[in-house]
Design a protein with these regions (language model features):
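A structural signal for small-residue-enriched, beta-sheet-centric alpha/beta enzyme cores
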Residues: 120-126, 131-200
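Generic N-terminal targeting/processing segments that precede catalytic cores or assembly contacts
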Residues: 1-120
């Protein structure tokens, strides 16, 4: 069981807001140390629990991701974990009405510029990601998965080929010296073999 310190707790009649601070452990994560807020509002006339993104959580603008266009960039696993935690709390207090959960990250829009999100068409903030709720030092795996997500998105839009460059120098050369569509470029870092394998 994970115990986290709560910050900025605010309780009103039908609403409660609190935040936790992300601990990325040994992972070199741009989101390390940021506050992630949850706002939970009672919706007595409903029986549904909903989860959405607020300020600093990105919105999907292109097809090919786990969420539909227009939805908050909250991946299925963390969304399911949030729903389960809220359902458990509602059961504990015998509450049977609806609840609206809004996740927000005040620094999210600024931090998102340092992530893959702009390339994936996620605008306005970061993505809420995860598979277990615990950060593991697996940056290499995370980068390869990010490349795979970007590739899948291109293919879902009907593109038949992609251009792979190791990094910024290759991307700059492509833009300045070759008559090729730059928007089809994917940066693969040192993972050329893995990228080719995923393309096959």
């Amino acid at each position: 069981l994970l115990h986290l310190e709560l910050h900025d707790v605010c309780m009103e009649k039908d609403t409660v807001i609190c935040a936790v601070r992300k601990d990325a452990g040994d992972d070199p994560d741009t989101t390390n140390g940021i506050l992630v807020y949850a706002r939970v509002e009672k919706c007595p006339k409903s029986s549904e629990i909903t989860v959405d993104g607020g300020k600093g959580v990105g919105r999907v603008t292109r097809p090919g991701l786990s969420q539909k266009v227009g939805e908050a960039a909250i991946n299925p696993v963390p969304k399911a974990m949030i729903l389960k935690a809220v359902e458990d709390a509602a059961d504990r207090y015998h509450y049977e009405g609806g609840l609206k959960v809004t996740i927000s990250v005040p620094e999210g829009e600024k931090i998102a510029k340092k992530t893959f999100n702009p390339r994936l068409g996620i605008q306005g903030g970061i993505s809420i990601l995860g598979t277990s709720g615990i950060v593991e030092p697996m940056s290499e795996k995370a980068l390869i998965q990010s490349i795979q997500v970007e590739m899948k998105q291109h293919f879902s839009q009907g593109e038949q080929y992609l251009i792979v460059t190791p990094g910024n120098y290759g991307a700059d050369y492509l833009r300045e010296h070759m008559d090729l569509p730059f928007e089809k470029n994917i940066k693969c870092s040192n993972y050329v073999g893995e990228t080719i394998d995923m393309a096959v």
